[in-house]
């Protein structure tokens, strides 16, 4: 059962944003850094006059057959096309700065701390969102490479952005624990305490 085409058009948020004055802009870093593989999931953060973006780079191309799965690849409706010599699905993040025309003026790879050897095939901080809290920048996302089962847990990493030296470095990392029986979590947030 597919969705009604009229309903699909009504759900197109990008189209609605453009119709109401929004702009589209390509977010591209040099292909020498990405080897031509995917850029996705930008997280836009406006900090005063600065427009900052966390841009996710993956070492694969994702083929996904939408629209009632009418156009699947020979491997099925969802396929990861990755280098033959590296079967892992690796995420790296880039912090970018845009001007008011949404043109990229700076970009820098986020140097993550080497706290562990990845033990699952999904490697890196996935779907990271850039936030600022008490004048410190953080990336908040999910990491699945710390267990042999690929269990994803939210993590937040404090980062230092140094535009003068074109560096972004992870300073600290906190893995948000699984809630205990007497703890509660707010959706999309850090632990909220004892839940009492």
Give names to the regions the model predicted.
Residues 1-121, 132-196:
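Beta-rich carbohydrate-recognition and catalytic domains
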Residues 124-130:
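A conserved donor-nucleotide-binding helix/loop in the catalytic core
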């Amino acid at each position: 059962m597919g969705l009604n085409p009229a309903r699909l058009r009504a759900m197109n948020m990008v189209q609605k944003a453009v119709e109401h004055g929004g702009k589209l802009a390509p977010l591209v870093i040099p292909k020498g850094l990405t080897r031509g593989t995917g850029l996705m999931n930008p997280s836009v953060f406006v900090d005063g006059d600065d427009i900052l973006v966390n841009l996710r780079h993956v070492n694969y191309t994702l083929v996904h057959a939408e629209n009632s799965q009418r156009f699947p690849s020979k491997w099925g409706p969802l396929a990861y096309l990755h280098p033959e010599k590296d079967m892992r699905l690796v995420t790296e993040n880039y912090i970018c700065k845009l001007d008011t025309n949404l043109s990229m003026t700076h970009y820098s790879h986020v140097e993550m701390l080497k706290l562990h050897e990845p033990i699952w095939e999904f490697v890196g901080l996935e779907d990271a969102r850039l936030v600022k809290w008490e004048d410190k920048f953080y990336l908040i996302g999910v990491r699945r490479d710390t267990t042999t089962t690929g269990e994803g847990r939210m993590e937040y990493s404090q980062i230092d952005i140094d535009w003068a030296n074109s560096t972004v470095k992870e300073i600290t990392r906190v893995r948000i624990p699984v809630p205990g029986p007497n703890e509660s979590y707010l959706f999309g947030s850090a632990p909220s305490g004892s839940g009492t």
